[in-house]
Swiss-Prot record:
Transmembrane segments: 33-53, 77-98, 113-133, 178-198, 226-246, 288-308, 320-340, 347-367
Species in which this protein is naturally found: Lonchophylla chocoana
Swiss-Prot/TrEMBL cofactor(s): heme b
Gene Ontology MF terms in the entry: metal ion binding; ubiquinol-cytochrome-c reductase activity
Protein name per its UniProtKB record: Cytochrome b
Other facts noted in the record for this chain: Heme 1 (or BL or b562) is low-potential and absorbs at about 562 nm, and heme 2 (or BH or b566) is high-potential and absorbs at about 566 nm.
Length: 379
């Protein structure tokens, strides 16, 4: 008799995705981050759902409702800090996942890659709107500064900003709609994740060598289910440690002051995972130019498959490209540091240099290096 998991209309979809899925036998731990992102998303939706039961999206009570969650709700502080630090874990896994894709040439699966970029934008939008909800000083001023960037769009900019605000400043209407969108977007992200997996399973997984692995496949279960569970345990241990020992390590002290439109904080900055993009934005003295650079800092990933000039897919056997890749990582870490610093010498010039280098590596140096490597191998 055929197993029910192979015949049942619903179960056979799950079976072909997580049980009998043919998977390359050589996948390293860098392939764990996809499933870790799934766990992060589940944790965020669950904790977010329980937080939404106690939160009130009103400028008069939002800050107090978050305080109430932390002080009066049973284990409310765990929910709140799991959600806040869960977002940090989400972005750590997200950036490592994208980095893996760049290093091993996974971007040649263009549909999967482009859905991934769409997912990155959706998660960033969700995180930004979530940061506004506690209605602290950094929530309010972060929302004001970032939404104001849209006013740089020619002709329609000012009207667009007022339309998003629901008035002439960030106020009650803005908070209410941000809460609505923050609640809705994770479910859209979940749907996009399914499309992402659908396209991935059309082609099968890439592997560290970048060589087709059709002759050497193993079933996903039990090999990679066990491997993924180890990843889950490591990540959840790290998250729990962060939540239970230093929950405010990655937050901003300014957000413990209720929002005050009459008092601007000395340094307005987003959460750490947006600092690299914020540094790129600030490195251009023109408003519209800065906004374009900000969008392109992520959108540039969409051009990467077009600029793949190497005869090899993965960087595993390409030492020159590897050096460039790690230079790119160092550049991003530098940008993250600069994004948290005040706008003064020498931070401005370091930020501008790192921004130029970031785009240079991805758009010019990597394709040229690949051509040089092809020549060295007489290909």
């Amino acid at each position: 008799m055929t197993n029910i998991r192979k015949t049942h209309p619903l179960l056979k979809i799950l079976n072909s995705s997580f049980v009998d899925l043919p998977t390359p036998s050589s996948l390293s731990s860098w392939w764990n981050f996809g499933s870790l992102l799934g766990v992060c998303l589940a944790v965020q939706i669950l904790t977010g759902l329980f937080l939404a039961m106690h939160y009130t999206a009103d400028t008069a009570t939002a800050f107090d409702s978050v305080t109430h969650i932390c002080r009066d709700v049973n284990y409310g502080w765990v929910l709140r800090y799991m959600h806040a630090n869960g977002a940090s874990m989400f972005f750590i896994c997200l950036y490592l996942h994208v980095g893996r894709g760049l290093y091993y040439g996974s971007y040649t699966y263009t549909e999967t890659w482009n859905i991934g970029i769409l997912l990155l934008f959706a998660v960033m939008a969700t995180a930004f709107m979530g940061y506004v909800l506690p209605w602290g000083q950094m929530s309010f001023w972060g929302a004001t500064v970032i939404t104001n960037l849209l006013s740089a769009i020619p002709y329609i900019g000012t009207e667009l900003v007022q339309w998003i605000w629901g008035g002439f400043s960030v106020d009650k209407a803005t908070l209410t709609r941000f809460f609505a969108f923050h609640f809705l977007l994770p479910f859209i992200v979940t749907a996009l994740v399914m499309v992402h997996l659908l396209f991935l399973h059309e082609t099968g997984s890439n592997n560290p060598t970048g060589i087709p692995s059709d002759p050497d496949m193993i079933p996903f279960h039990p090999y990679y289910t066990i491997k993924d569970i180890l990843g889950f345990l490591i990540m959840l241990t790290a998250l729990s440690t962060l939540v239970l020992f230093s929950p405010d390590l990655l937050g901003d002290p300014d957000n413990y002051t209720p929002a005050n439109p009459l008092n601007t904080p000395p340094h307005i900055k987003p959460e750490w995972y947006f600092l690299f993009a914020y540094a790129i934005l600030r490195s251009i003295p023109n408003k519209l130019g800065g906004v374009l650079a900000l969008v392109l800092s992520i959108l540039v990933l969409a051009i990467v498959p077009v600029l793949h000039t190497s005869k090899q897919r993965s960087m595993m056997f390409r030492p020159l490209s590897q050096c460039l890749f790690w230079l790119l990582v160092a550049t991003l870490l530098t940008l993250t540091w600069i994004g948290g610093q005040p706008v003064e010498y020498p931070y401005v010039i370091i930020g501008q240099t790192a921004s130029v280098l970031y785009f240079m590596i991805l758009l010019v140096l990597m394709p040229l290096t690949s051509i040089v490597e092809n020549k060295l191998l007489k290909w």
